[in-house]
Design a protein with these regions (language model features):
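Acidic/aromatic-lined carbohydrate-recognition and catalytic surfaces
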Residues: 1-130, 141, 148, 152-203
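Pore-domain-biased detector for 6-TM cation channels and related repeats
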Residues: 135-136, 142
Length: 208
């Protein structure tokens, strides 16, 4: 209902309108010197996103038989070769002392802190970061003036230094594409805690 379980980062949810509606809105905002920000969720996706569905299918499949450094024999539907498995956090055993892991298939678990429908993305993976740079490029080209980044402090919960490093890379990319791009991050912490995030180069942050 809240649309933070993203199924497609390159589409407008039909409840909000069409891509044409977005483009027209962006054009009208530009005429009025209003920045139109995209609410961008990098912490997690929907479990119905193609990345997660592809990884899930591979984890339920048998290995194709080829070595990891050789081409897959099953069109990358394979627990050895599927790159999307590393887009998320999967494990063979449920970690003890946490309720944020959910079963997939008979012997695998995935992490989803906010809900079972929103698996955590692995922002340690450079390929995942590159995906979001491409997503940013797409929306900036469509006329967005920047981004509101959701749940920034949860990228690596309890590790603000790593969160800041992710933000810094994202900011450098966005400012290279559009120096006037404006980015604000949701950091749900006290003022004294979230001010450290300005060291990432982000334009603004907000919290409680």
């Amino acid at each position: 209902y809240h649309k933070y379980s993203v199924k497609d980062y390159y589409a407008v949810d039909e409840q909000y309108g069409t891509m044409q509606d977005f483009e027209e809105l962006a054009a009208e905002c530009e005429k009025r010197e209003i920045k139109l920000l995209i609410d961008l969720v990098m912490n997690h996706s929907s479990n119905e996103h193609e990345w997660f569905k592809h990884a899930s299918k591979s984890l339920r499949s048998d290995p194709c038989g080829a070595a990891k450094d050789k081409p897959c024999l099953n069109d990358n539907i394979c627990p050895v070769h599927d790159k999307y498995i590393d887009y998320y956090y999967f494990t063979d055993e449920k970690p003890v002392g946490t309720n944020s892991w959910y079963r997939i298939g008979s012997n695998r678990w995935y992490q989803a802190v906010f809900s079972e429908q929103m698996p955590e993305l692995n922002l340690d993976n450079s390929a995942v970061r590159s995906e979001f740079e491409k997503i940013a490029d797409f929306w900036l080209e469509k006329g967005a003036g920047g981004f509101r980044l959701d749940a920034v402090k949860e990228y690596f919960s309890g590790n603000p230094e790593k969160n800041i490093e992710v933000l810094n890379q994202f900011m450098k990319h966005c400012k290279t594409v559009d120096p006037k791009c404006y980015v604000v991050g949701e950091v749900w912490e006290s003022f004294t805690s979230y001010t450290k995030y300005f060291s990432s180069g982000i334009d603004s942050v907000f919290g409680c």
